[in-house]
A protein has these predicted regions:
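Tandem repeat scaffolds
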Residues: 1-152
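Terminal module of membrane-associated proteins
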Residues: 130-218
Length: 218
């Protein structure tokens, strides 16, 4: 029997002739399958939010700061990212339709299997990685042993950071981790977090930062 988790998601929809709903700032939340329509997110800070499978329509993110967030299978329809600051995010299999990115700053971000032709006036920073195909990672027996053990970590599994449904690995996140840590380091660092709650490790970037913190303590 699969594990059940507490549902945490946003469902903000501004109806006709009603005041525009405002998106509150948030940090370290797993907000899968959220839905935001005709909302105001101007000048807001969003840190380490996981919007897997979410839908945004006519949301105004102008001048917002979006840091360390994950967007897997997320759709953006006629959203405004003008002058937004987007850093350390992951966009995987996303769909953009007629979105504005005028003077947006995008850096240290990974974009995979995502067509950005629907992003008007987008300019990608020097340290943005764009992958047309889902990557694989370097398999080792030590790594696979700790990945198997981490299947029992409730929050690591809930946030789908290392494992995906169908008993599959999250190859993208593991690929990104192997760019930051050596093949010898990564399994050891993952073991160090295996017995922890990891409640706040909601996105890839939070996981990376936690492993870096563990490395400093070794």
């Amino acid at each position: 029997m699969g594990q059940t988790y507490r549902i945490d998601r946003l469902n903000l929809i501004t109806r006709k002739r009603r005041p525009q709903k405002v998106v509150n700032e948030a940090r370290c939340r797993y907000l899968a399958k959220s839905q935001l329509v005709k909302c105001n997110a101007q000048n807001k800070h969003f840190d380490y939010l996981n919007f897997r499978g979410s839908h945004f329509k006519k949301v105004d993110f102008s001048f917002a700061k979006i840091s360390g967030c994950d967007f897997w299978g997320t759709s953006f329809n006629k959203c405004n990212f003008s002058n937004a600051y987007i850093t350390d995010c992951v966009f995987m299999g996303c769909k953009f339709i007629d979105c504005k990115f005028d003077t947006a700053h995008i850096e240290y971000t990974t974009i995979v299997n995502t067509n950005i032709s629907g992003c008007r006036n987008i300019v990608l920073g020097k340290f943005v990685e764009v992958l047309s195909q889902y990557p694989d990672f370097q398999h080792t027996s030590d790594l696979e042993e700790v990945l198997e053990a981490l299947k029992n970590n409730t929050n690591i599994c809930k946030y789908k950071l290392l494992h995906l449904p169908g008993n599959k690995y999250n190859r993208l996140n593991i690929y990104l981790l192997q760019k930051k840590f050596s093949p010898e380091e990564l399994p050891k660092l993952l073991w160090r977090i295996s017995g922890k709650s990891n409640k706040n490790l909601t996105t890839y970037k939070r996981l990376e930062l936690e492993l870096k913190a563990e490395k400093r303590m070794v």
